[in-house]
Amino acid sequence: MEAAADGSAETQSPVEKDSPAKTQSPAQDTSTVSRNSADTGKVLALPEHTKKPKGYLPAESVKILRDWMYKHRFKAYPSEEEKQMLSEKTNLSLSQISNWFINARRRILPDMLKRHGNDPNIGHETGKDAHATHLQSTDASVPAKSGPSGPENVQSLPVWPLPKGQMSGEKLPDPESAPSQNPTVIAQPKKKVKVSVTSPSSPEPVPPEEYPDFSSFQLLVDAAVQRAAELELEKKQEPNP
């Protein structure tokens, strides 16, 4: 009997020892799984909290920048000193101010200029375009000053006195047709110069560009005077009857 009891105890002891472990293992597994899931949930939730919210600049800073742009709307390009000054007023970095002005010149500035009656194309005209328009305006003003003379300008010319030949009604030779019809007329000014050198009483030579050539008329006058002098001399030499 004792041997049988010992045998039953030996047979039951392993089962009794193993049964609590088997009954406790599912609870431990569920607890570990819940802990792991909670940890993973925390890990997954961390990036959402660590992401920086995509917000805008403060309203006060934007107002300061817009006021500055309105004052300098015809040249909305702040210098480094002005950017530093705006950075101190708005508590923004220089890169934020530069980016804001880049976007504002494309989106805010055209509307701002149109509201105040200024076209953005005229306000932001480049240096080359302005120089080209200045040259066009100067070129347009030059012909107005040095244009062809009209009838009004011809009437305002000074009136020169007419030569003696025209006042007496004598027909003067045409200077344009004279060289082609009579080639010897070209040598007449030379004769006139010689006569003026030898005889001091002859009139001074007149350039052919200013007045027409009157050398033939002068020769006729000299010949008539000489003939009259000869006739008078002959009368004096004749004996009285």
From Swiss-Prot:
Gene Ontology cellular component list: nucleus
Molecular function per GO: DNA binding
CDD domains (UniProt xref): homeodomain (cd00086)
Residue ranges: DNA binding: 48-111
Protein keywords: DNA-binding, Homeobox, Nucleus, Transcription, Transcription regulation
InterPro entries for the chain: HD (IPR001356), Homeodomain-like_sf (IPR009057), KN_HD (IPR008422), TALE_homeobox (IPR050224)
Region described as Disordered: spans on this chain: 1-56, 115-213
Record-level GO BP terms: regulation of DNA-templated transcription
Superkingdom, natural source: Eukaryota
Main location class: nucleus
Biased composition (Polar residues): 21-39
Family statement: Belongs to the TALE/TGIF homeobox family.
Described function: May have a transcription role in testis.
Protein name, entry field: Homeobox protein TGIF2LX
Organism: Hylobates lar
